[in-house]
């Protein structure tokens, strides 16, 4: 019994409160009050906001369009491309005849019209507005000529950097982020900058033998002023968050100099320095400023000569199409008379497989061996650029050939606008890195740029259409359906059975034609 009593724990007393003030401290025991019981709140029902999807459906009757859309199981006829990609076509057996009309081409882009009008106002002339496109001419300088050109590239970059430093010293953009308007009018003027930097320019010219032309150095000052102005406009319009114009590094990959048309004489430029110059095309009929570019990777000297293309009439067909860019096929084209599928993604993967293997190997070497020599690093980086250039050249070849064919067959093209920037961002964890790489190689944004340029050149209107609900909407009845990962769109209300990409291409065409139809 005594052992059992020993194991029992003694009772712990309540907390003590010590009252001070007198010499003797009195110990007072205070009992804790039980907590007040609060009335229980009734559970509040959370209301979930429901948003109705805005329908993009346009009926076939409104656009005078047929209900025709091919079934997924069909036999395509292949089109010769003279390149690495595939181009297949399926024709509508009940297609209507296409009307033709004459159109004067090329069409001058609105941005070019605006720039030419501003130039006419500034120079107080009435020059006609023309379509300008650049022509590439490769030159083959000798070793002595290459040495002279390399020094000229270096001096051009030095003059550009010194002019930008001078403009920055005048505090055009304040530390608070505000722009000093009075300073921009005075400083961002090439004549005032030229006067201020006359001594620096003359010293740079005297430092070389044979000396560089003064007008070429003046072009560097003019280029710096124009680049500064464009950076300011981008900052004002909110396209750039922080104003920052960086100077050129002398050892950069691509170097340029700007040459005036007066220096081109006798199938060469600057005949006092370069009496003879080999070129891929004759250097004649040059009446505008030309830029000479040197690429250190390819070791090529290329002249970009602006040419005016004269206007002429072309027989165009009244035929419009919708294009859905995607990952199964690069492009899916729909028109009332035919559908086309251009370059399946499997072919892109197979053609770029070897290049990406070598790129991954080089990247692994750079990551695993950080303490490499500078020469070794330069070689590895040059190899990276080489294999990336091969991939871009393949895509460039496909872009130009596809856009040329589309522009010649259709008079209006409605293409879906993909937000590739948000898809390729690090925040997007849904897509895998392999899919992101495929999207990056296809480069849809560059394709749309090239297609619009070709459209202006050959008289075809190109419209960018938002892809909102184009895949989910039935092109026949307008019912919205979640497809998920299925490749076929099967409508439950009207019974339409078609390929999902072709259905999306038809919806893109309808949305693109909607404002055009209302204007008519």
UniProtKB/Swiss-Prot annotation:
Segments traversing the membrane: none
Keyword Iron belongs to the record: no
Biological process according to GO: DNA recombination; transposition
InterPro entries noted in UniProt: Cas12f1-like_TNB, Recombinase/Transposase-rel, Transposase, Transposase_put_HTH
Residues that, per the record, bind Zn(2+): 474, 477, 491, 494
Pfam families (alphabetical): Cas12f1-like_TNB, HTH_OrfB_IS605, OrfB_IS605
Region (Disordered) location: 23-44
Nuclease keyword on record: no
Top-level division of the source organism's lineage: Viruses
Cysteine pairs bridged by disulfides in the record: none
UniProt entry keywords in alphabetical sequence: DNA recombination, DNA-binding, Metal-binding, Transposition, Zinc
Gene Ontology terms, MF aspect: DNA binding; metal ion binding
Coiled-coil segments on the chain, per record: none
Family classification: In the central section; belongs to the transposase 2 family.
NCBIfam families: guided_TnpB, IS200/IS605 family accessory protein TnpB-like domain
Record protein name field: TnpB-like protein L770
Organism, as annotated: Acanthamoeba polyphaga mimivirus (APMV)
